[in-house]
């Protein structure tokens, strides 16, 4: 369990950082509030009118989106942490689990990282408009300086959470790409070995059949694979020698069993000779013959 934790420690720490940073940005945005006073010039009034307003995240739709995105990222990071800790304590070989779980983690991490990046970009734009203003938007930070200062901290935390989420997504994509590469390499290697084996079998099976006809009941050294050319250090050749021997043995047995044996041959039985008793029953006695030939009195 400790070895698995050491291997996945970076991923766990990044998920933990993304969760805490996004949660902190969410709490700061939701709890941030300030009451401000500003003057309004009314036509016909000699003095401006003071108005009171409360700044919070519900006044701007962009802040609502920012708070919702930070909540989603924090919840997703907590869910992934729970799954990772459960796999560690259960002794699973990998935090990502199988291929399906790896794909789900990859898609979820990419979605969370892009959502966090979009929320951070929206918050940065709102902070710039609040500080600098626009032709149709006044700089509200002159009236709500404390609110803008605290919101700037939330923007920084959002960008840090985005960085952690992007690193998590990159690690997930690396694991997924590594698994896919290993699977493709294994398939390619298996295809190459099968092709070599098929070519060798086409050349070796006739020799085995011929030798099986000549030496049905004698054991001989298995033939070397044709592609080895006498090299005994080839790993593939060494692994295939036992396969050639087993193949020769099975083919020899098949050839031996295919030939009809004396027991299996159907020999017609010899013609039956009548016994002495049967002969006596068939041949009439002399007295009976005489009685049959004597005329009636």
From Swiss-Prot:
Ordered alphabetically, the record's keywords are: Cell membrane, Membrane, Transmembrane, Transmembrane helix
Q: Which InterPro entries has this protein been placed in?
A: CASP/CASPL, CASP_dom
Instruction: Give the record's membrane topology.
Output: Multi-pass membrane protein
Task: Mark the transmembrane ranges.
Answer: 11-31, 65-85, 102-122, 149-169
Q: How does it assemble?
A: Homodimer and heterodimers.
Q: Which family does it belong to?
A: Belongs to the Casparian strip membrane proteins (CASP) family.
Which PANTHER family does its entry note? CASP-LIKE PROTEIN 2C1-RELATED, CASP-LIKE PROTEIN 4A4
- From the Swiss-Prot or TrEMBL record, give the protein name: CASP-like protein 2U8
From which source organism is this entry? Answer: Selaginella moellendorffii (Spikemoss)
